[in-house]
């Protein structure tokens, strides 16, 4: 792996590694120029219960396309999902998205990974150069929730460079906690939860994975549901 990043390396950390990451970054920067409807991190926190509720409604979509019922969506099932939802991505784009969101490298997306993938698709369909259908992802009820997640990232990314830095996270938390002594620790904890690759910068995908955990959605939700179903039947 690469060496530890030094203080002056933030610009290097922000360079996208793949064509998909470059496209996500470009689309996010364009979206950030429009600003956020959220006024503070606290206003986002107040939306957590509703966001959690709406994301869990996505479970039915997940189960519909998990045709073999193994609790994960594989590449073939994702291709079928995109065709059914009329998401007009190329095979290369679909493969890249699958690889990007299959963070466990087990050739199957769990529920939380599927949510992240759909939200990335929602963002990418904001590309004015793309000729797509009226509903971005064929799931209009979920799109308002995804827009809130995009709004949240835009709120945090004060300098609109497509990444959230440690300083920006501290600033957002400080605005919420009104100078409480614990605010710095809270901000650092939240940032560390987001910064998976420890490069000091958080991209939109990292933010989404952290956010699903914040609202209570984990990658083992399917297993917990199965256990719960079994107990009820007994």
Task: Report the location of each language-model feature.
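Eukaryotic modular interaction domains in large regulatory/scaffold proteins
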Residues: 146-199, 203
């Amino acid at each position: 792996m690469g060496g530890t990043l030094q203080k002056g390396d933030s610009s290097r950390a922000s360079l996208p590694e793949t064509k998909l990451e470059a496209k996500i970054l470009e689309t996010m920067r364009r979206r950030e120029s429009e600003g956020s409807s959220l006024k503070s991190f606290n206003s986002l926190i107040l939306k957590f219960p509703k966001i959690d509720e709406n994301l869990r409604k996505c479970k039915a979509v997940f189960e519909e396309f998990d045709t073999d019922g193994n609790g994960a969506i594989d590449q073939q099932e994702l291709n079928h999902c995109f065709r059914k939802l009329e998401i007009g991505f190329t095979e290369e784009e679909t493969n890249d998205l699958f690889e990007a969101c299959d963070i466990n490298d087990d050739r199957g997306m769990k529920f939380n990974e599927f949510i992240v993938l759909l939200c990335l698709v929602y963002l990418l369909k904001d590309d004015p150069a793309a000729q797509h259908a009226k509903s971005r992802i064929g799931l209009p009820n979920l799109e308002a929730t995804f827009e809130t997640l995009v709004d949240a990232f835009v709120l945090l990314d004060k300098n609109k460079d497509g990444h959230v830095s440690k300083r920006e996270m501290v600033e957002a938390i400080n605005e919420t906690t009104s100078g409480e002594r614990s605010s710095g620790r809270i901000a650092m904890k939240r940032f560390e939860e987001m910064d998976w690759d420890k490069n000091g910068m958080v991209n939109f995908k990292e933010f989404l994975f952290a956010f699903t955990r914040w609202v209570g959605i984990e990658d083992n939700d399917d297993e917990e549901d199965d256990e719960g179903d079994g107990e009820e039947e007994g």
